[in-house]
Swiss-Prot record:
Pfam family for this entry, one: Ribosomal_L28
GO biological process terms held by the UniProt record: translation
GO cellular component: cytosolic large ribosomal subunit
Protein name: Large ribosomal subunit protein bL28
Gene: rpmB
Molecular-function GO term, any one: structural constituent of ribosome
Entry-linked InterPro entries: Ribosomal_bL28 (IPR026569), Ribosomal_bL28/bL31-like_sf (IPR034704), Ribosomal_bL28_bact-type (IPR001383), Ribosomal_bL28_sf (IPR037147)
Keywords, alphabetical: Ribonucleoprotein, Ribosomal protein
The keyword Ribosomal protein is annotated on this UniProt entry: yes
Similarity annotation: Belongs to the bacterial ribosomal protein bL28 family.
NCBIfam families in the record: L28
Length: 78
């Protein structure tokens, strides 16, 4: 399963791990992706989303209905 937030689109980044001796090796910075079930009153059902913790804060701010409308407008099936 891909590590991409359905709300923000956050995905893994590539960077360096830097040692005390300043040696650099490649590493991945992974987003904090969570599976979360939300109750959608208008549809009378639960919706499960894979989203980052920032995505959860966006849902708290805008509401689940507005966020679902944006996701569906992108053509993603929920």
């Amino acid at each position: 399963m891909s590590r991409v937030c359905q709300v923000t689109g956050k995905r893994p980044m590539v960077g360096h791990k830097v040692s005390h001796a300043n040696n650099k090796t490649k590493r991945r910075f992974l987003p904090n992706i969570q599976n979360h079930k939300f109750w959608v009153e208008e549809e009378n059902r639960f919706v499960t989303l894979r989203l980052s913790t920032k995505g959860m804060r966006i849902i708290d701010k805008l509401g689940i209905k507005a966020v679902l409308d944006k996701i569906r407008a992108k053509g993603e099936k929920i």
